[in-house]
Amino acid sequence: MEEGPGFPFFLPKGMILKNQLIDYWRQIHTAAGYQEISTPIILSRKLWERSGHWDHYKENMYTTIIDDEDFAIKPMNCPGGILVYKNKMHSYKDLPLRMGELGIVHRHELSGALHGLMRVRCFTQDDAHIFMTREQIKDEIKGVVQLIDSVYSTFGFKYHIELSTQPEDSMGAKEDWDIATPVSYT
């Protein structure tokens, strides 16, 4: 609709389908040991700067000012998921800790790139954050691949998985990449 270009409107039948997909998502993630979380749509600019997202994505972020402070509508869920994890102390015995979120995200896509429901400015992102020990990396990767396979097979989707390694403009410590990348290959 021209009143909200790139922002989908879901009519009653579309909502029935969307809710069935959400129910399916909850069922398979619960069975795989995920805890569902929800994080705010608007978070402070300071958080986005601290996470590194501001430097990488600010051109695609919608911003606002609240009480003289800069905020942004989230283009991704990661910083919020990290805040949920950091909300309390965890023992290594709590790990792996799997958190899943169907978070609503907004990205300022160029108007020429918009295409039906395939390329929009607001969408629900199936996101997961797994907190684990180094020794658990391999098993957790296997679990994620099995979960992906289960979902894609259910819907008859064909897929191909490739391993992406550290890009030049990556976020995160090089030491963490150096540990995780070789384990991912095995």
Q: Where are the predicted features?
A:
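Conserved alpha/beta enzyme-core scaffolds, especially Rossmann-like or related mixed alpha/beta domains
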Residues: 1-12, 119-178
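Conserved small/polar residues in nucleotide/adenosyl-binding loops
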Residues: 185-186
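Auxiliary tRNA-acceptor-end handling modules of aminoacyl-tRNA synthetases
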Residues: 1-114, 118, 130, 149, ...
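Short glycine/threonine-rich loop-to-helix capping motif typified by GTGT followed
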Residues: 48-59, 167-182
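Hydrophobic face of alpha-helices
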Residues: 18, 22, 26, 138-145, ...
